[in-house]
Amino acid sequence: MLKRGVYAASLSVLNKDLTLNVEATISHAENLIKNGLHGCFFFGSTGMSQLISKNEKMELISKISTHKQRKHFYLGTGCNSLNENIELIKYASEFNFNTILLMPSAYYVGNSDEGVFEFYKKIILACPKIKIVIYNFQKLSGYILSLIHISEPTRRRTI
């Protein structure tokens, strides 16, 4: 779980063919930690998560799972697909990444409260041991999360 501190999004370094350069991406994140951050997140919007394939994400997850800075590394999914989110979270959980940065699907404009809650609820039901860091990025997701919207479902652990 996250402790009090300064956390940042880590960028994704791409090769000339636009595939993920796993080693350079990890090296960048390692430098963030060495320069004083308490942790960093892979596969958020800064990490261009929407453009990184599931297989590339899985490769990075397996590599950082044994990295010496492992305890400072956290993951987002960066997926619009509910099923792909669940699959990637389950894969990350196999490597004990149980705190996941998760934003509502950013594909459709005008998400409803009900739709967003169902999205989170289905992920929690499929992956009950994870802790979710709710990623509230209105300009990307087209949705405004507020404390009022999430307090009761969070308390009941339905979201």
Task: Report residues per predicted region.
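Active-site beta->alpha loop and helix N-cap motifs at the rims of alpha/beta catalytic domains
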Residues: 2-143
